[in-house]
């Protein structure tokens, strides 16, 4: 059809023979015969993991950091495998997980401007909880950026694996915090749904009370999770301040401040939502945990910012 030789394969076990391994084997075999692999074609759907592994393989082969977004990794795989060579390859319609994925990313799929406008509207959601989670994601992203910038900077070649590992860790935190952006709004909406439940009969009152109890508990657990995930980012942000590219130290500092905003903002949501929790023991548990985590975060960020200022005075 295309006037080219073709190698057809059915990969039945990608744990044994990965997509990129099969492609590379064909490429090497063709090279031995003086031929050039011009691209490849995928028939049907493919698991996301196969393309992610391929993308990371080619990034490592290029001595590039693998701590980039999933979308970028898949883009690298598609380009390196030549999956666009015969016809456009659309990951949204060719990757199994993307085809099955429910449309639950209502806020994180918005543009920056639309998210801001939506927040500014008269609707109570998204509110402080979602904004706190997003601030945390931005903080993690800045730490990730410093890691990736340093990984490819002259003089840091021998530390590629270290900075790439930090960037991968940061990407995972970004994913968790972006999920919590929408999860916080879903938690708030579950309270509204419970409040709208009928309460005429005894059975209806019991069902409504049970739903409210569950919704209130979730409305505390979600921002508390935001606090924990955001606070955990300070470890790698501190490492980027100490070991990263000195020219990017201010970016790491801004990342730390974003994390503090995320933790303290989510902490406010834990406090205000705890008012609806009837279980006094659980209320005390969450309030104490949140207070300790907030205090530790403020202290850690203070040290990071002092470190940043010191680095900037040494490297004007």
Language model features: what each stretch is:
Residues 1-113, 121, 207, 211-214:
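Long, contiguous binding/interaction regions
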Residues 1-2, 32-46, 50, 157-158, ...:
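Flexible, glycine/charged-enriched surface loops at secondary-structure junctions
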Residues 11-13, 119-146, 247-266:
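Conserved phosphate/anionic-ligand binding catalytic regions in large, soluble enzymes, centered on
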Residues 102-117, 225, 232, 273:
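Polytopic transmembrane helical bundles with strong interfacial aromatic enrichment
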Residues 107, 123-134, 158, 162, ...:
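Non-transmembrane, amphipathic alpha-helical segments
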Residues 146, 174-181, 188, 220-227, ...:
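A structural signal for well-ordered alpha-helices, especially hydrophobic packing surfaces
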Residues 152-198, 293-294, 299-301:
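A structural-propensity feature for long, helix-poor, extended segments
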Residues 184-257, 273:
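Amphipathic alpha-helical interface segments
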């Amino acid at each position: 059809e295309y006037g080219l030789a073709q190698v057809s394969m059915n990969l039945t076990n990608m744990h044994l023979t990965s997509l990129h391994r099969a492609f590379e084997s064909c490429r090497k075999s063709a090279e031995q015969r003086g031929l050039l692999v011009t691209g490849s074609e995928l028939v049907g759907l493919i698991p996301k993991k196969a393309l992610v592994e391929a993308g990371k393989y080619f990034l490592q082969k290029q001595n590039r950091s693998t701590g980039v977004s999933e979308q970028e990794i898949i883009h690298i795989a598609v380009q390196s495998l030549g999956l666009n060579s015969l016809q456009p390859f659309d990951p949204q319609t060719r990757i199994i997980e993307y085809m099955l994925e429910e449309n639950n990313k209502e806020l994180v799929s918005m543009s920056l401007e639309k998210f801001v406008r939506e927040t500014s509207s008269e609707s109570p959601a998204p509110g402080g909880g979602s904004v706190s989670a997003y601030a945390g994601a931005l903080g993690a992203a800045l730490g990730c950026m410093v890691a990736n910038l340093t990984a490819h900077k002259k003089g840091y070649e021998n530390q590629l694996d270290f900075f790439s590992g930090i960037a991968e860790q940061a990407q995972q935190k970004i994913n968790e915090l972006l999920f919590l952006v929408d999860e916080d709004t879903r938690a708030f909406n579950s309270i509204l749904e419970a409040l709208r439940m009928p309460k005429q009969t005894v059975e209806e009152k019991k069902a409504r009370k049970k739903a409210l109890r569950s919704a209130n508990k979730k409305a505390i657990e979600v921002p508390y999770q935001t606090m924990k995930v955001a606070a955990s980012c300070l470890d790698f942000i501190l490492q980027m301040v100490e070991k990263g590219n000195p020219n990017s130290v201010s970016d790491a500092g801004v990342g730390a401040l974003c994390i503090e905003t995320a933790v303290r903002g989510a902490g406010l949501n834990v406090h205000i939502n705890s008012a609806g929790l009837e279980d006094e023991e659980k209320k005390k548990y969450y309030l104490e945990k949140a207070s300790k985590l907030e205090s530790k975060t403020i202290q850690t960020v203070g040290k990071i910012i002092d470190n940043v200022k010191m680095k900037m005075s040494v490297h004007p």
